[in-house]
Regions:
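Conserved N-terminal segment of class I S-adenosyl-L-methionine
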Residues: 1-123, 127, 140, 156, ...
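Residue-level detector of anion-binding/catalytic polar loops
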Residues: 102, 152, 196
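C-terminal lobe and adjacent flexible extensions of AdoMet/dcAdoMet transferase-like proteins
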Residues: 209-210
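A short His-aromatic
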Residues: 128-132
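A short, conserved alpha-helix within the catalytic core of class I
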Residues: 133-143, 157
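Alpha-helical subdomain
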Residues: 164-168, 172-184
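Short conserved AdoMet
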Residues: 76, 134, 148
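Conserved beta-strand signature within the Rossmann-like core of class I S-adenosyl-L-methionine
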Residues: 150-158
Length: 210
């Protein structure tokens, strides 16, 4: 077994909950669910369809602004961005477009057009998406490939730290959440790809491609 985040082999059992095994990578400190317990693609998609993310809902926009506000300060006016894993209600795309940015969007279930792979972007957002990655190493490499040098990747996910009771953690209980990251994980990801890394607030990380 190798870590799906960094491909390291220094893995140990972290916890066993409801007959599901969770492992921790001692290299990058990611925690991940045994792939034997992953949902089928159909079951996963059905869960996502249940999400009610109205792109004009002010509460949802307020939630997304936790990433929007810090990354928009890094950007030149009108540059092109990509929302990676935008889900069925791409509100963040709408927020950037309203501010004058040119946006593409990608989601493997709802917006599966992969033409973005032939382009490059000044910024990429990945909001409440990385915890769903079955193959995060490959996903982050794909993102890195289409991110311009000097460009920004903004990511939002719940960070794990050892003060959290993992068994009772609501974020773990979502059956579509299969990978959990700590601050240490993100610093490791950055060092492996020659990105700089800053954490402007809780559960938000900004990477710059050097």
């Amino acid at each position: 077994m190798t870590c799906p985040v960094c491909k390291g082999s220094n893995i140990e059992l972290f916890d066993q909950i409801d007959q599901k095994n969770y492992f921790e990578c001692n290299t990058c400190k990611a925690i991940f669910l045994d792939r034997k317990s992953h949902l089928t693609l159909q079951d996963e998609q059905e869960r996502y369809i249940q999400h009610n993310n109205d792109i004009y809902d002010p509460e949802y926009r307020r939630f997304l602004s936790r990433l929007y506000n810090p990354i928009v300060k890094k950007l030149s006016a009108g540059v092109m961005g990509l929302d990676y894993g935008c889900g069925p209600g791409p509100a963040l795309v709408q927020m950037f477009r309203e501010a004058g940015f040119v946006m593409d969007l990608y989601d493997p279930y709802f917006f599966p057009d992969t033409s973005f792979l032939s382009k490059t972007y000044k910024f990429i957002t990945c909001t409440e998406t990385a915890e769903h990655f079955y193959k995060p190493f490959e996903e982050f490499n794909k993102i890195n490939k289409v991110l311009d040098r000097g460009g920004w990747l903004g990511l939002m996910t719940k960070f794990f730290d050892k003060s959290i009771n993992f068994k009772d953690w609501y974020y773990r209980k979502d059956p579509t959440h299969v990978c959990f990251y700590s601050e240490e994980t993100f610093h490791f990801l950055a060092s492996e790809r020659n990105w700089s890394c800053e954490i402007p607030s809780k559960d938000i990380v900004l990477f710059k491609k050097n």
